[in-house]
Amino acid sequence: MGYVVPNAYRNRVARNIAGETPRPDIVPAYAKLGSGRYNSSTGELTDPAPTDTDVQSPIPGYTNLPVTVSVVGNSVQVRLQVPGGATPVDVTEIGVFTSDGTAVVLDSFRPVTLQAPLTLQTTYTIYPEV
């Protein structure tokens, strides 16, 4: 499992560090779960390092999930905790976004089945490039 921070967000952070954009523009605000970027026939990731701007196949009901953001030194930690529902859902991708929809993190991985009483928890640590 590996994730990418898209260039659009990296550029926004660089502009923020330079004092050109306000802090709220770079704060992660919500997450989406998806079921794309994985071929169940071959068991392979179809896009293990996504470079576009959204999850490939959003899962209905899992598209506006709250995240917890904390600053640790010069990094930002984004935590996501999603309780499973009554129906099992195979999750193969996660996207974290700012309030205006700019992708902060795009991640793809082999399927994780989410169903109550299980909870999906993940943490991403982002370091600014200066």
Locate each region found by the language model.
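Small cysteine-rich, disulfide-bonded extracellular modules of the LU/uPAR three-finger superfamily
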Residues: 1-91, 99-130
